[in-house]
Design a protein with these regions (language model features):
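Metallocofactor- and cofactor-centric catalytic cores in central/energy metabolism, strongly enriched
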Residues: 1-135, 148, 156-165, 171-178, ...
Length: 192
């Protein structure tokens, strides 16, 4: 997931530039509420489940790249995985990187809070070889996801006896989570 190709800049023909607008207006993203005991417990349960699967040999002892959605539960899972001494350092390969996973990632979109973005700017030398942004045609490509052996984690609202999962709607009409690229990862992951 951390392999790199290309250049760390975009080459543009100067004749095609019509104007440059300088601004110090920061990018903004919606933050998430602080973790509560319930989200912490969910995160710990998922981390314990993955650690047990690794101990049984279902997941390799080197672990696998992780794909995760966004939100309080995803942040709680990643926090619990980070604290678990039995799980080695791992890479992220996901469609969207948020604050909770910015220190290790590969994605097609970087959406972080203002404080996190400023932290990236302030420590660019550290992050330069840690973050890789790719077009979604690559990051969500089923063949790439399958080849990497990604562990896909997404929040499910409900599941039926046949394994069908509703991860978007409550009561049929209220949308709770966006679908995004989760389907690409879920169908092609090593474990989902």
């Amino acid at each position: 997931p951390s392999d790199r190709i290309g250049q760390p800049y975009i080459q543009v023909d100067p004749k095609k530039i019509v104007g440059i607008v300088e601004t110090n207006w920061p990018d903004e993203a919606r933050g998430f509420a602080d973790a509560d005991p319930l989200t912490d417990k969910i995160g710990q349960n998922v981390a314990d489940f993955l650690a047990a699967d690794m101990k049984r040999g279902i997941i390799p002892s080197t672990f696998l790249p992780l794909q995760s959605g966004v939100g309080n539960i995803a942040n709680a899972v990643l926090g619990a995985l980070g604290r678990d001494k039995t799980i080695p350092a791992f890479e992220m390969y996901t469609g969207l990187i948020r604050d909770g996973r910015v220190k290790f990632g590969s994605a097609c979109s970087l959406t972080v809070t203002n404080d996190c973005l400023q932290g990236i700017y302030d420590d660019m030398d550290f992050f330069r070889d840690k973050l890789v942004l790719r077009p979604s045609e690559i990051s969500n490509n089923p063949e790439v996801v399958r080849r990497l052996g990604v562990i896909s984690i997404n929040t499910a609202i409900e599941a039926d006896l046949y394994g069908n999962v509703n991860s978007t709607h409550i009561g049929g009409t209220k949308m709770m989570n966006g679908i995004g690229g989760s389907g690409d990862f879920t169908r092609n992951a090593y474990i989902s």
